Design a protein with these regions (language model features):
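Residue-level signature of the transmembrane alpha-helical core
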Residues: 11, 15, 19, 53, ...
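Hydrophobic alpha-helical transmembrane segments in multi-pass integral membrane proteins
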Residues: 148-156, 194-199, 246-258
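N-terminal, intrinsically disordered charge-dense segments
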Residues: 282-286
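Small-residue hotspots at the loop-to-helix junctions and early N-terminal turns
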Residues: 45-49, 180-184
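Transmembrane helix exit motif
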Residues: 62-72, 93, 101, 109-134, ...
């Protein structure tokens, strides 16, 4: 690929992913496949993920700033929840080698389908603006959700923004705009936690990461402004589309991995009798 085309496509990918992530979330569904297609095939997977995480972090922080200028959020609950999410996300990244991540995809697929069905049935979900203050119990539950989703983001990742938005809408009664802004605060801290893992390990290729981050940042500004202007109805439709895309990806990955594992098991099962038969014939000849 010509160098000029590479940089143009990298900028376009970063901008579109930043716009999508700021507006409704799920920018990684676009950015990660784009990076795997654009970057040299010799690039380690960890470096691809490091470049993606650095750019996403810049875009998310910028979009968060845009939201916070216009949308009031429950800081009393968000700040401690964000701190716990940061710590849990870092622990999740460390725990990847000990945790059977392959079981996360089917579980998340079921959760995402349930969220999609629930949101579709509840037409008024996320449409009303909450005015009353949070109770002490709700604040404590916020700490639990922050730690739980932060750990999930560190160990697996896909659908984190959707989970945060759904929690704030379903369990706290916020509208989608406030839920999106609140979720961005916590998501920013989990991205920062991931960077504290990727950067010291040398997994961020700065030439690509900075360029992608600038494009992601610009897309984040545009996406946040579109979401604020579109309001809760726009975000509800965007949330539904994002859930469908995430379900499609998780479903495809689960089916593909299942077919591969079944094929490997079948080959392994049929090889053993043949190998044993050959050894038996060889022994008879002797």
């Amino acid at each position: 690929m010509p160098v000029d085309s590479f940089f143009y496509l990298l900028l376009l990918t970063g901008f579109c992913a930043g716009l999508m992530d700021a507006a409704v979330g799920g920018g990684g569904l676009l950015q990660i496949p784009g990076l795997f297609n654009l970057l040299p095939t010799s690039t380690p997977v960890a470096s691809v993920m490091g470049v993606n995480k650095f750019a996403s972090c810049c875009g998310t922080v910028t979009a968060t700033g845009q939201y916070l200028r216009r949308i009031p959020v429950p800081w009393k609950m968000l700040l401690p929840a964000a701190v716990l999410a940061f710590a849990a996300s870092y622990l999740g990244a460390k725990a990847v080698v000990f945790f059977p991540v392959q079981y996360m995809k089917p579980a998340m697929l079921v959760i995402m389908i349930a969220m999609c069905v629930y949101t579709f049935i509840k037409k008024d979900l996320g449409q009303t603006v909450r005015t009353e203050k949070l109770t002490r119990r709700e604040t404590l539950w916020g700490l639990f959700f922050g730690a739980l989703i932060g750990f999930y983001d560190g160990i697996f990742g896909p659908g984190t923004g959707s989970l945060l938005a759904f929690v704030f809408v379903r369990f706290y009664g916020y509208d989608f705009l406030t839920a999106n802004a609140s979720g961005k605060v916590i998501n920013s801290t989990t991205n920062l936690a991931a960077l504290t893992f990727f950067i010291p390990q040398g997994h961020v290729v700065w030439a690509w990461a900075i360029l992608l981050a600038l494009a992601n940042l610009c897309g984040g500004v545009v996406g946040a402004k579109l979401a604020i202007r579109g309001g809760t109805q726009f975000l509800r439709y965007g949330f539904m589309v994002l859930l469908c895309l995430t379900i499609d990806k998780l479903g495809f990955d689960s089916i593909t991995e299942g077919v591969q594992q079944a094929g490997f098991a079948r080959r392994k099962r049929f090889r053993r009798p043949l190998y044993a038969k050959i050894r038996h014939l060889s022994a008879s000849d002797r």
